[in-house]
Amino acid sequence: MKEPAAPAPGAAASHRKNPLAAPAAIAACVIVFYWVPMTSPSASIQGDAADVHYPMQKYLSDRFSPRQFPFWTPYVLSGYPLLANPKVGAWYPPNWPFLLAGITPRSIQLELALNALLACLGAYLLISSHVENRMAAMLGAFAYGLSGFFAGHASQVSLFAAAAMFPWLLVAYRRAIDIAPVRYTAFGGLVGGALILAGSGQAAVSSFLGLGLYAFADWWRERQGWLRDVAIIGFMLAGALACAAIQLVPAQELARESSHAADSSPIVEGFLHPGSLMTLVAPDWLGAISGGIQAPSGAAQFYFYAGLLVLPLALMGAVKSGVRLPGLFLIVPPVWYMLGPAGGLYYLGSLAPGLRSLHAPVEGWFLAALGLAFLAAAGAEWIFAGWRFPFLPVLVAGLLFVDVWYWNSLGNPLAYVRASFDELYGSSEEAGRAEAIKQPQLTRFHAPANRVSMGPKLHPLDLKLEATYGASLLDPGPYRDYLDAMERNPKLRDGLNVGRFLNVATGRIDENASVLARAYFPKAVVDVRSLAESRQALETLDPAVKSLVLWPHAPIRQDPDAAAMGVRYGEQWYRVHYHAVSPSLLKLSVAWYPGWHADLDGQPLPIIRVDHALMGVIVPAGDNEVAFNFHSKRFGTGLAISLASGLVLVMCVRVGRPSHHRKRKKHRHSRRVTA
C-alpha cells in the first residue's frame, strides 16, 4: 500500500469546513449512550455514587449560599469538615450547574453523562491533532470516553470526572507546543486545576504522569526541545496546583489529621492481573455482565472493554502508523507499573511519593485506555486511506459505537442499576427517618457504619441524624482512636454524647441511660502530656468521673458544681450558657479539629483537646455565655491563591499569541501513515 501524500491546502480548508460537525455528532452519540440511565424510571446510580457522592452533594446543594458554606457538618463522625473532603466535588466547575439546580440521584447520572461527553470531546481533539481523518478521530473518541474504564467506574464519580479531563490536559500541551505556548500553557493550568478539583488525588497524579509520558514521546521522536517541554509541563502543573488551592489547602490539613496520615504500608491489592486483559476482547470474561464476578478485587476495576475492533485497530496503528509513539508511551509504562511487584517497574515507581500514595494502581488504566484509543484511531486512518470505500469510516465508527453502547451501557450492570433509587433505598430511608425522629435532641446515634440500613451509607447527612460514624470518609486519627477504644470500653459512649446505639448482639436499637450532655463540666480533670498517653488512658476512662486534658493549657481549678445551663446550636456553631465559681474546663462533645474558635464577650478562649479526640475550653468564673464557631483556617488562604492564579491564567489565555516557531512540519509528518 502506498503512503498517502500530505494533504493539499484545499484539503485543509475542507477539513475545517464544518468544525462543529464532529463534536455535534459525538454529543448526539453520548446522549444516545446515556439516554436510558438519564431518563428511565427503572435505572439509577449505585455503589459510591449513591452511597457517598449523592448524599454529600445533596447536603452541599441544600445549604448553598453565597454567605455561608457548609464547611462543617455535625451529622457524621461527631462533627466533620465536609468541604475539606475532595470527594464532595464542590469546586469542580462541571458540577456547579447541578449543585445550583438542586441535587437528586438523577443529577449524579447527568454529571456522569456530561463528563463522558467531555472525555469524548477531549479525546477527539487530541487524536485529531495527530490524524487527518475525522471519522478515525471520532472512533478514537468513542473508544476512550465510552470505554469499559468509565462503565466500570461509574460509581466512582470523582475518578470518572478526573479521567474525563485527562485528554484535555494533553490537548493543552499539544497546542502549547504547536500553536501558542503562553495561551495553551495557561489553559493547561486551568484544565489541570479542574482535574484536581474533580476530587480524585490518585487520578490527578496519574494524569500528570501521563502528561509526562506523552511529552517524552515527543522528545523521543525529535530528540530536541526537552527544556521547552519540561518548562511547559512545569508551568501547567504549577498553575493547576495554584488553581486547585481552594481544595488542596483544606484537604492537606484533613490528610495531616487523618488516621491514614502515618500509614505507609505497601499496597496489597489493586494490581493489574494479566487475565483481566481478556476483557479487552471478551467483556464478560470476569463475569461482570452475567453477574458471576470472579475478579480478584471486584469486576469493576478490571473491566476494560472498549469495542471488539479496538485491539486489532490498535495493533494495526502500532505497526503501520507513524504516530505510534504517543499511544505506546501511554500504554506500556503504565501497564508495566500496574502489574505491581510481578512486573518489576512497581518497585522503582514506588520510590516516588506520588506513586507510593496510589491506592490501587489499576485505577490508572485510563492512561492505557487513551493510548489504545489513540492507536486504534491511527490504525483506522491507515485502513480508511488504503481502502477508499466512501462509507467505510462511518460504518466502522458506527459499529464500534453500537458495540460499546450495548456492552458498556445497555447490557452492563456496572454502568447503572436496573431499579429506581426508591426501590434500592426507599424502605431503608423510611426506617431511617423513623429512627431519626426518635433520636433525642442534642444526642448522637452510634452503630458500626457497615451494619446500619437507613438508606445510603452517608444517610446521616440527609436524615439530619447526628451520628458517630461516616462511611468512606477520611476521618481524623484521634477520633478513630476513640471509636476503636469505645469497642473495648463502652463507657466512652457516654462522653461522646451517644443517646441511642445499635446493639450488635441483639440487632436492636437501645437507649443509653447514662449519656452525658453535649456540653458539660467534668467532675475532675487529669492532664496528659501526649496523644499517645491520652490514647492509652482511653482504655479505662470513665467520662462521668473525669476527663483527660492535653497539656499545655491555662490553670484549671475545676468547680465540681459548675453547670452548663443552656445550649443553643446550629450546624456550625454552639452557644453555651454556664455558671462556675472558679476557672473550669467546659467540655464540648464535638470532634476536635483545627478551625474551631471560642470566645467569651469578644475575648478569644483557646480550644484544647479533651478526652483525646474531643474539645473544650477553660472558662473563667462567673455566669456567662461561650460562643463556639467553626471557620476553616485554610479555606481563605486557598481561595485567595485560586482566585489570583485563576485570574492570571485567564488573562494569559486571552492575550497569548501564536508562536512564530510552530512545528507544523513535524505534525504534517506525524499525521502520515507508513506502509
In which residue ranges do the predicted regions lie?
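Active-site-proximal, structured, solvent-exposed surfaces of multi-pass membrane proteins
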Residues: 14, 53-56, 545-666
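Conserved luminal/periplasmic juxtamembrane motif of membrane-embedded glycan-processing enzymes
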Residues: 2-578, 583-591, 668-670, 675
